[in-house]
Amino acid sequence: MEAAALLSPTATSRSPLPLLSTAPAAHRLHVLLPLSGRRRRLCLRSSPRPRGSLGCAGDCVVRSMGSSRERGVLVKTSSSSASVESATQEVGAASSGEWSGDAIRRRFLDFYAARGHKILPSSSLVPDDPTVFLTIAGMLQFKPIFLGKEPRRVPCATTSQKCIRTNDIENVGRTSRHQTFFEMLGNFSFGDYFKKEAITWAWELTTKEFGLPPERLWISVFQDDDEAFSIWHNEVGVPKERIKRLGEDDNFWTSGATGPCGPCSEIYYDFYPERGSSDADLGDDSRFIEFYNLVFMQYNKKDDGSLEPLKQKNIDTGMGLERMARILQKVPNNYETDLIFPIIEKAASMALVSYTTADDAMKTNLKIIGDHMRAVVYLISDGVIPSNIGRGYVVRRLIRRVVRTGRLIGIRGDGHGNSEGAFLPSLAEVAISLSTEIDPDVESRRKSILGELQREELRFVQTLERGEKLLDELLDEALSSAGNNGGKPCLSGKDVFLLYDTYGFPVEITAEISGERGVIVDMKGFDMEMENQRKQSQAAHNVVKLSVGNETEIVKSIPDTEFLGYDSLSATAVVKGLLVNGNSVNVVSEGSDVEIFLDRTPFYAESGGQVGDNGFLYVYGEEDAKQKAVIEINDVQKSLGNIFVHKGTIKQGSVEVGKEIDAAVDAKLRQGAKAHHTATHLLQSALKSIIGSETSQAGSLVAFDRLRFDFNFHRPLSEEELMKIESLVNQWVSSATHLETKVMDLQDAKNAGAIAMFGEKYGEQVRVVEVPGVSMELCGGTHVSNTAEIRGFKIISEQGIASGVRRIEAVAGDAFVEYVCARDNYMRCLCSSLKVKAEDVNGRVETILEELRTTRNEVSSLRSKIAVLKAASLANKATTIDNTRVVVENMGDVDADGLKSAAEYLVDTLEDPAAVILGSSPGDGKVSLVAAFSPGVVKMGIQAGKFVGGIAKLCGGGGGGKPNFAQAGGRKPENLPGALEKARDEIVAAISSKSS
């Protein structure tokens, strides 16, 4: 179930949401929603019951679909009841061979298209919704329509939606249904049809089109939904004993404390009808699989909790494609469907194993690889680049799980003879080949996807190698600590989790290596760390809050705003509404901040990266035409789709609902936005031309005085590349090319090669902005009419903002002229100060820098010599502890280099064994520490690196080094005397204990 899974407390032990319902009870997904003044807990079903593959016992033989749609490979499995073959042999009149995943998807979409539904493409995995982390259901792209925030584009629609869910990632591969990536088939009605059609069509689709035996289908309905029960029984003909009435927690969907809500109904497939119906429990996952859910949005929940019928009743449904494929293809789990299994087969061949004969552990690992590769390919295709934050971390984590799992099962090399190469691209090739039907854009982004995966894998392999080194150090430390306190050496759960999460070390490998060294692993502590991360991931990824607030209710009564700003910067309009602090008012007086709604406007509202216009609204007298009010507009935003909200301050007089006003946009600022917006289009084309067509936009800002463009690329741009990009843009600017704008069908625009803007939603008709021969983009922003109006283009900076994402900031138009003039003025001042011509500035600066470097080196050398002279006097102050010479001193304001020289001098001057610990505070708020131990001290087992690092913590810092020499620093100079006293006590104690 889609909306229910997202929005309501309707799924506890029996989730209506396909593919998202197999976690143990402890792993439920909770969404807190306010209902009738109390908090309600939503659980996406996480059944506590154990599951078999399909509920068969002993050694079962099942027919499994593979990369060839009709391959019929025999697979041995083990479960709990009769054979899978017998459990599925009655499915459909057609053989399982004709039911490929693509065929199921096409049949579903064509079925509803024949019944008046518009087939719409899947939306991005990156939702246009700040309340949702990733797209986790098919209804997300229609949420604003269901909540009344946007007008319906079509009366009814059908989709196959790409979805991602990662909060139960540890169960992937271990159950028959858990996946991170899945497809949700859905049909949606926006007031066009309702319960009867939804139910009868769902039944016709499953029994006639897909051929599922009616006697194997069970139905659940909301306990009070007599209408649905009647339709299922009296019109469809389902026996009463196979229709279960369930409560509000299972079968009622609500969007929040108030707003649209309604009952839902689910269709289950029964693998074992011979068990009878007297005590059948739809929550028995070994027997039933819920594959289709229908949500009937028929009520509006009021503030007092009462329900009133909606004027527009909606339908939201969801069918898990992988679940239906599992049923029709007669395989024991979702992974062995032809949607995933070709990736698994490729991974098995690269690991030199056969999936058919592999043990359960190997199969689990191969399933993890197959699932995760689908997820990362689609995420990267949708613009999510591996990083350490947000969605990028999801991709990085999935990639690292594939890499470490692949290495665990023996995959080495790229599959093409290169043992040092990356193997992810070879697996991704298979995933991309399976993507054509659901997302044709994936193929066009092949090069970018493969490159990103290769770079990330090779980087992670280096991280793994660093992890191996860290593990060795942690084991040394555990053994050392145990030796000092007489305990048993143990690797903490926190350290095990660090190795697992940051360095990708499988826990079993950590445990194995630790065992070889005689160190036990704190698995309880590790499990606690994993649970904490799971809770954080769950909270970040799956909480969806929907509510229709007071302001939204007010704005819903306002008509859409007619935008005039493409052709005019001024217009007469009528005030349709006023908001002050979110409350509706009829009149607003001087000095107040206000949000104004007009029936039409020349002001551009912020969207597509372009900021909203600034300007003024004027109110004139009806009789004397004198100016009565002035409102300064400093921002314009969109609300509920196409309602423009003019935000500003009443500078003079008052404004009233229903009155006529004159609107005037600040022409200078608008021209700046136009120049920067067109320059942004040219910049993107230049980037594709210079560094490669696979680069794509990852975000943008078009302001009045600058532009910012984020793009996907794996390295910094060179100075030469930046110069070429800048030169190319300026070449296009000087060509004085006229821009062309036209409105086209979305698909026609894409076919013509138009580039879609990052994160934007598009309707059936789109506006296309073209610089002929240079750029063509889908864009609703404002632009210059001729590239010459841009005047010039200058890149200000280029930098990385995340892993795989770069940012260019630049200026154009008047801002370009101002920038160049300012830089010219700086150069004049510099020439005057250096007393050289502009062309000689670089040479003069290099000379000054070289002189400065020489002077600094001389100063550093003198300081070191002074420190050594001071150290000479310290040698006489050395104390002797059990034949070991010890010096612990504060050397005042000596810098780090001088301190190092002094320590080296002392340890060389004193007879072995000798230990020297020196500290200083150069006066810049910092502390320097150094420890130098002679070979004799090191042989005692006293290491300089560990010793000085511990002392440095007292000074608010840290450090380390080799056993014989180490340096550290800190930021608390006031603690230095106490730290050195502690150092003296500890080195004396350490030497004394070793000598005894």
From Swiss-Prot:
Q: Which reaction does it catalyse?
A: tRNA(Ala) + L-alanine + ATP = L-alanyl-tRNA(Ala) + AMP + diphosphate
Q: One GO cellular component from the entry?
A: cytosol
Entry binding sites for Zn(2+): H677, H681, C779, H783
GO MF annotations, alphabetized: alanine-tRNA ligase activity; aminoacyl-tRNA deacylase activity; ATP binding; tRNA binding; zinc ion binding
In terms of domain of life, where is this protein from? Eukaryota
State which Enzyme Commission number(s) the record gives. Answer: 6.1.1.7
Q: Output the CDD domains linked to this UniProt entry.
A: AlaRS_core
Main localization of the protein described in the UniProt heading: plastid
Q: Where in the cell is it found?
A: Plastid, Chloroplast; Mitochondrion
One Gene Ontology term of the biological-process aspect is:
alanyl-tRNA aminoacylation
Pfam families, per the entry: DHHA1 (PF02272), tRNA-synt_2c (PF01411), tRNA_SAD (PF07973)
Cofactors: Zn(2+)
**Cysteine-cysteine disulfides:** none
Q: Which UniProt keywords apply?
A: Aminoacyl-tRNA synthetase, ATP-binding, Chloroplast, Ligase, Metal-binding, Mitochondrion, Nucleotide-binding, Plastid, Protein biosynthesis, RNA-binding, Transit peptide, tRNA-binding, Zinc
Identify its protein family: Belongs to the class-II aminoacyl-tRNA synthetase family.
User: Mind telling me which HAMAP family this protein's record contains?
Assistant: Ala_tRNA_synth_B (MF_00036_B), Ala_tRNA_synth_plantC (MF_03134)
Q: What is known of its domains?
A: Consists of three domains; the N-terminal catalytic domain, the editing domain and the C-terminal C-Ala domain. The editing domain removes incorrectly charged amino acids, while the C-Ala domain, along with tRNA(Ala), serves as a bridge to cooperatively bring together the editing and aminoacylation centers thus stimulating deacylation of misacylated tRNAs.
The subunit structure is: Monomer.
**General function of this protein:** Catalyzes the attachment of alanine to tRNA(Ala) in a two-step reaction: alanine is first activated by ATP to form Ala-AMP and then transferred to the acceptor end of tRNA(Ala). Also edits incorrectly charged tRNA(Ala) via its editing domain.
The identity of this protein, by name, is Alanine--tRNA ligase, chloroplastic/mitochondrial
Task: Write down the species.
Answer: Oryza sativa subsp. japonica
